[in-house]
Each structure stands twice: as C-alpha cells, then as structure tokens.
Amino acid sequence: MATKVSQIATTKVYVVKPNVTIAEAAKEMKEHNLGSLVVIDSQNRVVGIITERDIVKAASNRDIDSPVEKYMTKDVKGVTEDTEVTDALDIMLNNGFRHLPIIKSNGKLYGIVSIRDLARALLDVHTMQFGKPAEEVKGTGVICPVCGMEIDEYGYCGCGTGSG
C-alpha cells in the first residue's frame, strides 16, 4: 500500500492572513524556523503561501511593510489528504516547490508537507525494500528513490537525501 501525504503531514501549520506585513511574516518564520507560511482568509480557506523566496524578493525591493498578499503565491497547487507521497513529490519537483499544502475538499487546510518530509518517507520505503538504510548501502550500486541516482561511496546521491 502506498504512503499517503496525510500519513506524514505536519498538521500544526502556522498561518497568516493576507493583510499581515512581510516583516511580521518573516518574524513568525524565524521564530518557528519555518520555510513558509500558509495564507488563509477569514473563513480559514487557503488563499496563498508565502515562502522564504518571497520574503527575500520583498526585502530586496525594500518592501517589508507591504502585506504578504502582494508577494505570496496565489494559485496554490495543493494536494488532497489521499494523495500518494510519490505524486506529491512529482508535483513539487516539476514546479520547484519546497512546501505543499494539503487542502480538504472544503478548501480548508489539513496540513503541509515539505520536500524533506517526502524524502524521509521515501528513504523509509528504501529501508523497507532493501532492509538497510541508505548510509549502509553506499557505493553498492543502490539507487536513491528520490532522485534516481546511485548512492556514492560517501553515502550521498544527486539530491543529497541518500545519506539518510
């Protein structure tokens, strides 16, 4: 049975409203060591996501007092709770995302997964399939399930997750 994103999701998601300033969002992200914040409306529906990249763009424009809605990604490509981990990873890799909201059918937030969460889940599958973690199969011709490259003699692969 394939792993679903709901099985590995972070369900305690930090959110902001669209009118919060970039400076306030950056402070929240720093305080909680986050790479993104999900933006929700007054009905708690997902309307966007603000990421570190967006914060850097605003800062480089010297525009940190603007609301996050000016810089957030508005067309959020979220997934549903029953999306398989491999499908979520495919969406993230094809779109350059590092975070992917999990959105319920009513438009409200269920949770979030990061590229790191997905890589860990796939490495767990790797361990189940081969009986050993990636660092124990380094240099043996074993392929990383995330990037498809061989895990080298140092325990690394092309995407850096093969080291476990």
UniProtKB/Swiss-Prot annotation:
PROSITE patterns: CBS (PS51371). The keyword Aminoacyl-tRNA synthetase does not apply. Keywords: CBS domain, Repeat. It comes from the Archaea. Residues 9-66, 72-128 form the CBS domain. Disulfide bonds: none annotated. This is Uncharacterized 17.7 kDa protein in bps2 3'region.
